[in-house]
Amino acid sequence: FGLDTVVYNREECEKLGMGAFLAVAKGSSQEPKFIHMKYQVDNPKKKIAIIGKGITFDSGGLDIKPASSMLSMKDDMSAAACVLGVMSIIREFHPQVEVHGIIAACENMPGCSAYKPGDILTAKNGKTIEVDNTDAEGRLTLADALCYACELGVDEVIDLATLTGACMVALGTNAAGIMGNDDTLVKNLINTAERNGERYWELPLWDEYFDSLKSDIADMKNTGSRWGGASTAGVFLKKFVKDVKWAHIDIAGVAFLDK
């Protein structure tokens, strides 16, 4: 693509402190890869990072999915494919914007070394996470990716993920859910989607959603109440965003289509 690209292997991710991402990858024989692509220009008007969830197959881990729910899980890297698509064509448009494309790619498998419910993980920013369910793995990989992106000195971070079934329950397959910490960024993304024939619907990101994620032995759990699951996941991700405008787009409903 003509981009500056770095691909970190397992050992390099360990040195970077990506304990949450690497935990998800432990159950698979496939090597995890953390991918950072960069489109760079002189005197950029702003700097943006886009992150795509890159679970190349999601069995659910030890909290394994039913067989029928696993059939489409090769598509759990849909957001990573979106990021690759953007980065593959960005040079054709010559935007005066520095863009970082970030993907934490791995499988979530129930191998003999798999991470377990009850494990305590340490993310890149030092926050600890109690594993409540190994099938809530996407947010763990995104946690370290968000920390990494926030260290790049960017103005905005946008993450995309096939993150929650709860978003599909709320919005069906006709819209993606969006939330974030900056109203202007969120509204700009909603308006841009509408102009291009897509639908984003803003979901709340109230602090009260974090109540169900509280842990007695860690800074947070990776899952909480069954209610408000899309927003609960968003509040979890927010804990790994620092000093940057951020938006989270849950594309589960619009990615897993069979038509």
Where are these regions (language model features)?
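A generic structural signal for tightly packed, nonpolar segments enriched in small/aliphatic residues
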Residues: 1-259
